[in-house]
């Protein structure tokens, strides 16, 4: 398997790109900063990048609210595709850290539970939720 033979360079993109901790929804094309680092990453001998969470989240990236969208603090899906294309052109593979065992409070299905409570079709997605005030 290729991963066993690879040298990985890990990037926590929200920190690496200087994004604010709280997601205020303001679009910034920060992920493009990675393009400037490709020569350095290659010089280190890395042939794979491990990106910590890149999906839309409320704060630190591990509380995802949209798995189909790059965090607006980092840019657009097109920005990220450009970065991945440039990495691939230089022979660097891309691995994403997907956090799929939990979501953030901003996740659409959880928002539906907050709004519709027990009548939400997604209430069972979230284990034991107490609606009695506790």
Please place each PLM-identified region on the residue numbering:
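Acidic/aromatic-lined carbohydrate-recognition and catalytic surfaces
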Residues: 1-134
